């Protein structure tokens, strides 16, 4: 199956990008962001993972404030378009490839919501 990303010169095999180049069920692509305050009283972590060979997309946002943890978790069937980085109220947007990323979590039953933009402080290696 061809996807919108197949128009870009980013292939690593002759197959369409929707075809994973390994049959390993543990193969995945993941996003991970985190931050904390200098005193260690506040921490948050955001993760999203696409398990292409399992057909699963998972996401989470975890906050630790004054020693208490609060969390949102989401999971869905992986969308056919790898560029669809949403799961219910959770979404990642690539504002600038290898640069700025935006993470939003709309109002949901956990009471946690956010609109965060991550800006790199070093080059990608």
Cite the ranges covered by each PLM segment.
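Targeting-peptide/extracellular-domain and disordered-appendage signature
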Residues: 1-125
């Amino acid at each position: 199956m061809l996807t919108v990303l197949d128009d870009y010169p980013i292939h690593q095999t002759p197959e369409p990008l929707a075809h994973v180049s390994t049959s390993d069920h543990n193969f995945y692509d993941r996003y991970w962001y985190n931050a904390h305050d200098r005193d260690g009283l506040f921490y948050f972590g955001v993760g999203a993972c696409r398990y292409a060979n399992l057909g699963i997309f998972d996401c989470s946002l975890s906050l630790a404030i004054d020693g208490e943890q609060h969390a949102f978790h989401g999971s869905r069937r992986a969308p056919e378009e790898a560029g669809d980085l949403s799961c219910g109220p959770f979404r990642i947007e690539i504002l600038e490839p290898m640069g700025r990323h935006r993470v939003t979590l709309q109002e949901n039953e956990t009471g946690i919501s956010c609109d965060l933009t991550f800006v790199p402080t070093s080059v990608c290696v």
